[in-house]
């Protein structure tokens, strides 16, 4: 085992009891915590129960619906309630091969189960008999460690890594939850089905460890976990995350405005939820833009101005996105935005210049794979409500 000491950099931590009125009370694009976390009481309780009972869990929803925030909230509550429970989280966003996956998994498990770097070194010596990892760590136990393996060795003996959490849990009398975000990225690995078989063959035998797997590519996650021919079929409790209802958004928005000494009319809060289609990311972003424009009281007119500014702000992104769509895909989107329901009917095909019913099927599948459309039980919807608004009113000019 090789150990490299990383130069320690100062870490400044700040605490606060109350937000100043100059700081926005809305959060998006990062993990929501404490007062930023919105509702999800039932889902949180369900997830905490699964963690405490070591039930494998698969969480599926479109992008930016708050999966990561929900998992972080449930993990925090579960650890607070159970002194023997440890949660380790890894994100596969930038992980594109098995080698990187094994390194990330090892780092995650070691950090979650050791409070001192001496414990990390001890665990490596105890649980890695056939592998010789290279470890880089800081003298500060709160700082990151990094692990590297000889890929030739790992290919021959991946068992030690895949069983590491289970062995540590048995040794220390712990329960461990391994949370893996962007899990669908394993589909990009070499021979992904074989890799999935390897993961399941190990993980299904673990008795002191459970896995929470989630990701932002809904259609890919569905294929991995609901396809009877795939290794992870029926691996655990399958949860489909729903949107937060407008009834829950309204009191949240009013309270967040009130916390900074401002007010928002009920009609304005309703308008934010409607324009954002109750999409968690966009509700928070539109609320923030409305808050910026509010001196004392936010009105529906304030929200309308904020929405127009947000659409304009994102228009260049939407232009680039639409430029990468085919004419047939755009024609299908226009039909959907125009309220057409029988997309393969002769009248709709002719009206919108769609070549054939087969073209509808191909375009629909392509748009789902591009994360533009979502198909829930045959009902098509846009994953991005602001993009849908821009397409309808600015691009197609549908009135």
Describe every region a protein language model picked out:
Residues 77, 289, 366:
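Alpha-helical DNA-recognition elements
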Residues 250, 254-316, 377:
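Amphipathic alpha-helical "lid/sensor" segments that cap RecA-like P-loop NTPase cores
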Residues 237-248:
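Conserved AAA+ ATPase "SRH/arginine-finger" region at the nucleotide-binding site
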Residues 1-62, 80-83, 386, 399:
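A short, basic N-terminal segment
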């Amino acid at each position: 085992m090789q150990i490299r000491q990383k130069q320690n950099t100062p870490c400044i931590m700040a605490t606060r009891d109350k937000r100043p009125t100059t700081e926005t009370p809305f959060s998006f694009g990062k993990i929501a915590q404490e007062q930023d976390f919105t509702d999800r009481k039932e889902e949180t309780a369900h997830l905490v129960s699964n963690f405490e009972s070591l039930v494998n869990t698969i969480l599926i929803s479109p992008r930016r619906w708050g999966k990561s925030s929900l998992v972080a909230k449930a993990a925090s509550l579960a650890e607070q309630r159970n002194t023997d429970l440890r949660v380790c989280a890894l994100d596969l966003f930038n992980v594109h091969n098995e080698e990187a996956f094994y390194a990330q998994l090892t780092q995650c498990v070691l950090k979650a189960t050791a409070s001192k770097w001496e414990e990390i070194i001890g665990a490596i010596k105890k649980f890695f008999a056939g592998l010789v990892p290279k470890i880089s760590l800081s003298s500060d136990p709160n700082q990151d460690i990094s692990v590297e393996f000889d890929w030739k060795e790992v290919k021959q003996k991946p068992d030690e890594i895949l069983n590491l959490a289970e062995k540590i849990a048995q040794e220390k009398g712990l329960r461990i939850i391994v949370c893996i975000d962007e899990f669908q990225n394993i589909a990009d690995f070499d021979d992904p089905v074989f890799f999935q078989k390897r993961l399941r063959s190990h993980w299904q035998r673990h008795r002191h460890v459970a896995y929470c797997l989630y990701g932002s590519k809904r259609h890919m996650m569905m294929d991995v976990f609901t396809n009877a021919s795939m290794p992870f079929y029926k691996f655990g409790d399958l949860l489909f995350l729903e949107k937060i209802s407008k009834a829950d958004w309204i009191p949240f928005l009013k309270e967040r405005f009130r916390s900074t000494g401002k007010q928002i009319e009920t009609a304005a809060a309703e308008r934010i939820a409607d324009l954002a289609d109750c999409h968690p990311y966009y509700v928070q972003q539109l609320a923030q833009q409305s808050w910026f424009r509010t001196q004392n009281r936010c009105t529906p007119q304030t929200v309308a101005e904020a929405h127009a500014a947000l659409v304009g702000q994102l228009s260049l992104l939407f232009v680039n996105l639409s430029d990468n769509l085919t004419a047939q895909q755009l024609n299908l989107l226009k039909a959907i935005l125009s309220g057409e329901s029988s997309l393969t009917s002769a009248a709709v095909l002719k009206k919108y210049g769609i070549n054939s019913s087969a073209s509808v099927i191909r375009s629909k599948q392509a748009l789902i794979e591009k994360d533009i459309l979502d198909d829930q039980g045959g009902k098509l919807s846009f994953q991005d409500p602001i993009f849908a608004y821009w397409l309808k009113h600015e691009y197609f000019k549908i009135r």
